Amino acid sequence: MEHLITVHGCRTINYCGGPVTNGENLLRLKAYRDCLLRHGIPYEEKRVYHYNYEMESGIRIFDHFREADLIPDAFVCANDNIAVGLATRARETGFRIPDDFLITGFDNHDKASYF
């Protein structure tokens, strides 16, 4: 996230998380919140959505943010499966990555390198 803020100038960043009861997800959410606050960006609950760690979760999460008119400068995804699903749905609905927004995942899976 530091890179998204300091290099790319992102000011609206949505967190696409896994299960709200998952310990790793909660640590990533805390890091997201802490980074925003360090850079003077307000934490907004409406920019956070939890589901699961599957690719289909990224599709659901993107649809949620699009329907709520909350497309950010960047999406920070709790894992690469979510990021791939999100990127897939974004492209299906006419968005251009990275022109319209940036997406980052977590885990460094091979399939994410194609996005």
Where are these regions (language model features)?
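Bacterial carbohydrate/catabolite-sensing allosteric modules
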Residues: 1-115
